[in-house]
Amino acid sequence: MTGVAAPERIARAVRADIRALTAYPVADAAGCIKLDAMECPYELPAEVRDDIARAARETPLNRYPAAANPALQAQVRQAFEVPAQAGLLFGNGSDELIHLIIQACCEPGDTVLSPWPSFVYFDMAARLSHARFVGVPLTAGLELDLPATLAAIEAHQPKVVFLALPNNPTGGLWPDAAVRAILDAAPGLVVLDEAYQPFAGHTWMPRIMDEPNAVVMRTVSKIGLAGLRFGYLAGHPAWIAEFDKVRPPYNMDVLSQAVLAAVLRHKPVLDAQADRLHADRQPLADGLAALPGVTVFPSAGNFVLARFCGKLDGNAVHLALKTRKILVRNFSNAHPLLADCLRISVGTPTENAAVLSALQDILSA
């Protein structure tokens, strides 16, 4: 086989659907105001960083992580009010948990369903596992279309339904009554993705043991620990036991576990940061809504989705912001319902003022 050109080898070895994909894009943020990834803009205080450094120094790196970490599980339960009776599974970010759920539940050709547009990885993880993804379009106002969702559940009988609460990238928080109807209709598992729960003031976590076909999935990425890559899944122990069977051995490295344990001893710091972003969201939304040709959608996350329908479209506004070294996420070409939409993370007051000032200049030029 020597002498065969690399592209030909790749074509023989790599799945056609993988070759057709593009890698997830991450913009170079050097020197920029970064409002494109829903990260917390605040660095941890010095005393927290000192505890992290101490924990890292004391962590042995020559041994694999323990299969279970009861002390960290107890910390996570207390910090995030996970019911004592619930099973708990850690993942290398919620992305890994999405993979584990689909791998455990879906045979090739089985259906994974979600309102759409939503978190793009629901679709990607399904397709990577040879499952069929069904996205049920939101309404023109980017609200949940409950009748269409229930009809799709009846028609496709999905093994897994993902509900992002609040939804990303739109920011909408679906009503409890609608979620209840989906839980009652779904023939398989319903995953309640609460990645943005700290900014929504609403959760299904206290009720999860009352829901035999649901689990709650969360991440620490949005509350100041995006670099840590830590997610957790809570639900009936029987569900968690099945997902644990497909978890890669040693999936959570010892440093991530040690750092999280150190940070959770300062949980009020994380709560205060989330509260601040929650408080700053509405002023940012109001400032955007006051701009000419801009429509702002209600958000329960740490971001605001805005549509630009004036003399400049979303692509042009995105490029103009980028030339000013302000990064926001452009969804203009991602889905017809998101035409001309930009998603702007809530930053510091200074960053929020900067993006509003830049947009004022761009739209009035």
From Swiss-Prot:
Alphabetical keyword list: Amino-acid biosynthesis, Aminotransferase, Histidine biosynthesis, Pyridoxal phosphate, Transferase
Co-factor requirement: pyridoxal 5'-phosphate
GO biological process, one term: L-histidine biosynthetic process
Broadest EC class assigned to this enzyme: transferase
Disulfide bonds: none
EC number per UniProt: 2.6.1.9
Pfam families found in the cross-reference section: Aminotran_1_2
CDD domains per record: AAT_like
Swiss-Prot/TrEMBL catalytic activity: L-histidinol phosphate + 2-oxoglutarate = 3-(imidazol-4-yl)-2-oxopropyl phosphate + L-glutamate
Sites bearing N6-(pyridoxal phosphate)lysine, chain numbering: K222
Listed InterPro entries: Aminotransferase_I/II_large, HisP_aminotrans, PyrdxlP-dep_Trfase, PyrdxlP-dep_Trfase_major, PyrdxlP-dep_Trfase_small
Keyword field contains Amino-acid biosynthesis: yes
Gene Ontology MF annotations: histidinol-phosphate transaminase activity; pyridoxal phosphate binding
Pathway(s): Amino-acid biosynthesis; L-histidine biosynthesis; L-histidine from 5-phospho-alpha-D-ribose 1-diphosphate: step 7/9
NCBIfam families: hisC
PANTHER family according to UniProt: HISTIDINOL-PHOSPHATE AMINOTRANSFERASE, HISTIDINOL-PHOSPHATE AMINOTRANSFERASE-RELATED
Family, per entry: Belongs to the class-II pyridoxal-phosphate-dependent aminotransferase family. Histidinol-phosphate aminotransferase subfamily.
Binding partners and assembly: Homodimer.
HAMAP family per record: HisC_aminotrans_2
UniProt protein name: Histidinol-phosphate aminotransferase 2
Species classification: Bacteria, Pseudomonadati, Pseudomonadota, Betaproteobacteria, Burkholderiales
